Amino acid sequence: MEVILLERVAKLGQMGEIVKVKDGFARNFLLKRKKALRATAENKAKYEGMKAELEANNIKAKGEAAKVAEKIDGRDIVIIRQASESGQLFGSVSVRDIVVALAADGITVSRPQVWLDAPIKAIGQQKITIAIHPEVETSVTVTVARSADEAERIKRGEDISTRQEDRDAAAEAIAAAGEFFDPEAQEDEAAAGETAQ
């Protein structure tokens, strides 16, 4: 089916272009959401009549979206989740979680505006793109951590899996265990046991 786009649609075309799409996509998405009109002679004439109004509305919406993008751009959102020692999350962080975290920060976006290739399944930072308008995109940094303290360390760029403090504590534990366990003494006891038999 051929349709006339009433606004820019990602990976499809610009406003005013006549594009050929599958019937289901046209009926269930483009026409239903008023993003396009069927490309009939009558609708082509109708589009030409409302072209100036559509362009003016698009410029106005784009300006408002640019203001919102300025407010959002570069924000750092922290999401606290339970995770294993290796940093794998028990569950995942999805688009819905990001939208809720943004709303808690005073930013209202809808789920289709947040572009996330796959759910986040590990602790760390990830840049997420938000399409506020078909022509205006911005990004936020999502930090997933086990605690607020850990989130701060991740933001500073520390490698949380191999912290120096953890390595020092492990070395102290090994040294303390060495006081209770002397491998040479065990060898002497084993040798004494063999001679007694």
UniProtKB/Swiss-Prot annotation:
Pfam families linked: Ribosomal_L9_C, Ribosomal_L9_N
Gene Ontology annotations for the cellular component aspect, listed alphabetically: ribonucleoprotein complex; ribosome
PROSITE patterns on file: RIBOSOMAL_L9 (PS00651)
Ribonucleoprotein is among the record's keywords: yes
Superkingdom of origin organism: Bacteria
Biological processes per GO annotation: translation
An example Gene Ontology molecular-function term: structural constituent of ribosome
Keyword tags: Ribonucleoprotein, Ribosomal protein, RNA-binding, rRNA-binding
Protein's job: Binds to the 23S rRNA.
Name of this protein: Large ribosomal subunit protein bL9
Family from the record: Belongs to the bacterial ribosomal protein bL9 family.
Species: Bradyrhizobium sp. (strain BTAi1 / ATCC BAA-1182)
InterPro entries assigned to the protein according to its UniProt record, in alphabetical order: Ribosomal_bL9 (IPR000244), Ribosomal_bL9/RNase_H1_N (IPR009027), Ribosomal_bL9_bac/chp (IPR020594), Ribosomal_bL9_C (IPR020069), Ribosomal_bL9_C_sf (IPR036791), Ribosomal_bL9_N (IPR020070), Ribosomal_bL9_N_sf (IPR036935)
Record bears the keyword Repeat: no
Ranges of biased composition (kind: Acidic residues): 181-191
Ranges for region Disordered: 178-197
